[in-house]
Amino acid sequence: MDVDERLHQDENQTHPFSQKKSSSFLIKEKAATKSKDLEHIRLRDLNFNHRKKLDDKKLAKQIPVKANFKKPNEIEARANLNSNELTDINLDYIPDSPSIEKISGPEDSIVVTPRNIIHLQSDSDIILEECEHNYDCSPFYRLFNYENRIEPDDYEAIINAIITDEIAGTYPVFERELEYQELKSLVRKRDYIMYYFLSRDYRGFFQLKEERTLFYRYPSIAYTSPLRYLDNGSETEQFTGDDDEELQSFDFENTSSVRTLDSNIWR
């Protein structure tokens, strides 16, 4: 068989396939032209029928909504209550007293007992009397050169005390030194102007400064300062002889009142 005959035979075999292909293409083209017409346009299904329906059991039950809702009044609410349901109010409620041996915990729990519990002995006496005296006292302080004060007219003892402290390097301290240092840090220029031009000492700093200057200028004042326990006057006043006799007869052990050095207030 020649080559030309084979080519002609192959063309005859492929011709019916091309005819079938062209016929199917024409059918699709006709369908596409029909879909462009307004009469054949298909709208989207808004009911979602294409979705899978749920079972009736899984659907939630619809609750009807009241059209006219009216809020009940307080009188109507009270009328709906039965008198048998109400009880008396317990005004005398007394809670349980807490105890060291019992610690509150959740319900149905075992009572927890601490290890170290303070128990009173059976033969111990408990004092249940009310204390008449006031046992509150001021902080303890050391009286500097007040226990053995020197008389103002004993010049030899005063000079001896001054020389002894000068050699030992111990000097008397102004009793209101802390107050002086605190006021000194608070004083400003306007306080000096008000004091020197208008004689106004609002903080009391300048009066305290004069007392401190007098204290260090005359050291004998530190060694002859009187006791301040029974002094009801000002701090600059001195004791008299009658006050000394009263001081000697005063019973310090049976008194519960203690006075500070910086004030005349009994505590």
Swiss-Prot record:
Signal sequence, start to end: none
GO biological process, alphabetically ordered: ascospore formation
Transmembrane segments: none
Disordered: annotated span: 1-26
GO molecular function: mitogen-activated protein kinase binding; protein kinase inhibitor activity
Biased composition (Basic and acidic residues): 1-13
Polar residues compositional bias, start-end: 14-25
Name assigned to this protein: Meiosis-specific protein ISC10
UniProt keyword terms in alphabetical order: Cell cycle, Meiosis, Sporulation
Described function: Indispensable for spore formation.
Organism: Saccharomyces cerevisiae (strain ATCC 204508 / S288c)
